[in-house]
C-alpha cells in the first residue's frame, strides 16, 4: 500500500501541452490535401521529454465522450522537435470539425493529448465528422507503469490557485455548468484579487506558453443556424402600399398663399 502511495505522489500529469492548431481554425483540402501545422511544448512535469520514444498523430472527430479516429496522419521518432505538419487527404471524411490526437509513447507507458477543434473544408469523403463546434477538447490521459504496477494519473494541478503557479504551462479550473435560472439579486466576487507585475523591457523568451483546462464533465454544443435568411418584405408578401394605410387623403399646400395669409393676419 505504501509503495502505491509513493508512486502516485511522484507522478504528475501535463507532460505535453498542445498549442496548435487553434480553436475554429479552418483548413481547405479542395486541392487534394489539407496541410495542418501541429504545435506542442514539453512541460517540466513527469513524464519528461527524455522519457518519450515516439509521437503518433491521429485525425479524430466526435464529442468528447465518443472519440472516433478517422486516420493516422503521422508519426515522429525525433522527440527533439515541437512541431509537425500533417497532410490530410480530402477523401478521409466529409466537411466538418476535427481534432488531432497526440499519442506519446514512453518507455513505461503513454500519454494522450488532444488539440482544439478545427474545421476542414473541401473534403469529399463519405465518413461524417462532427458538425458541432465544442470549445473544450477531450480530457488528456496519462498512464505510466512501473514494474507490475500501473496507475492512471489524475493531475491535481488544476486545484492550485492560478496566481500561485509558475512554469511554461498553467492550469485553470474547469468551467462550471451554467444554471437554468438566475436567482442572485446582487453580485459577489468569486475569487480574491491577486497582485500583478509588468515587464519593464522585452524578454528574450516567453515565460508562459499556454494555459490548460481540464475537460468538462458535462456536454455543451453549438451549431450553425441552418434556417434560411428571411426574404425582403416585398418578396414574401409582407410588403404593402403605404397609401392603403392612410385614413385621410393627402393635400398639396400652396406655400405662397399660406405665407401671404400669415402676413395679413
UniProtKB/Swiss-Prot annotation:
The keyword Secreted applies. Residues 1-14 form the signal peptide. One of its GO terms (cellular component) is extracellular region. It holds the Pfam family Kre9_KNH. Residues 231-265 are annotated as: Disordered. It is found in: Secreted, Cell wall. Keywords: Cell wall, Cell wall biogenesis/degradation, Glycoprotein, Secreted, Signal. O-glycosylated. Its main location: secreted. GO terms for biological process: (1->6)-beta-D-glucan biosynthetic process; cell wall biogenesis; fungal-type cell wall organization. The keyword Membrane does not apply. InterPro entries: Kre9/Knh1 (IPR045328), Kre9/Knh1-like_N (IPR018466), Kre9/Knh1_C (IPR008659). PANTHER family: CELL WALL SYNTHESIS PROTEIN KNH1-RELATED. Belongs to the KRE9/KNH1 family. Involved in cell wall beta(1->6) glucan synthesis. This is Cell wall synthesis protein KNH1. It comes from Candida glabrata (strain ATCC 2001 / BCRC 20586 / JCM 3761 / NBRC 0622 / NRRL Y-65 / CBS 138).
Amino acid at each position: 500500500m505504501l509503495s502505491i502511495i509513493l508512486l502516485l505522489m511522484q507522478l504528475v500529469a501535463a507532460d505535453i501541452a498542445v498549442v496548435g492548431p487553434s480553436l475554429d481554425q479552418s483548413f481547405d483540402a479542395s486541392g487534394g490535401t489539407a496541410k495542418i501545422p501541429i504545435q506542442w511544448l514539453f512541460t517540466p512535469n513527469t513524464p519528461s521529454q527524455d522519457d518519450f520514444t515516439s509521437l503518433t498523430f491521429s485525425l479524430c472527430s466526435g464529442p468528447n465522450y465518443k472519440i472516433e479516429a478517422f486516420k493516422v496522419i503521422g508519426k515522429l521518432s525525433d522527440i527533439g522537435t515541437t512541431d509537425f505538419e500533417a497532410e490530410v487527404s480530402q477523401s478521409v471524411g466529409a466537411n466538418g470539425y476535427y481534432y488531432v490526437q497526440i499519442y506519446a509513447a514512453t518507455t513505461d507507458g503513454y500519454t494522450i493529448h488532444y488539440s482544439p477543434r478545427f474545421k476542414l473544408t473541401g473534403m469529399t469523403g463519405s465518413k461524417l465528422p462532427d458538425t458541432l463546434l465544442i470549445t473544450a477538447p477531450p480530457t488528456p490521459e496519462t498512464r505510466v507503469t512501473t514494474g507490475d504496477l500501473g496507475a492512471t494519473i489524475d493531475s491535481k494541478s488544476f486545484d492550485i490557485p492560478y496566481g500561485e503557479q509558475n512554469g511554461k504551462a498553467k492550469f485553470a479550473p474547469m468551467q462550471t455548468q451554467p444554471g437554468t435560472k438566475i436567482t442572485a439579486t446582487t453580485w459577489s466576487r468569486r475569487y480574491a484579487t491577486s497582485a500583478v507585475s509588468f515587464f519593464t523591457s522585452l524578454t528574450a523568451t516567453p515565460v508562459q506558453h499556454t494555459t490548460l483546462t481540464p475537460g468538462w464533465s458535462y456536454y455543451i454544443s453549438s451549431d450553425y443556424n441552418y434556417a434560411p435568411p428571411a426574404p425582403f418584405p416585398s418578396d414574401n408578401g409582407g410588403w404593402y402600399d403605404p397609401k392603403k394605410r392612410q385614413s385621410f387623403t393627402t393635400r398639396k399646400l400652396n406655400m405662397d398663399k399660406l405665407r401671404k395669409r400669415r402676413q395679413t393676419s
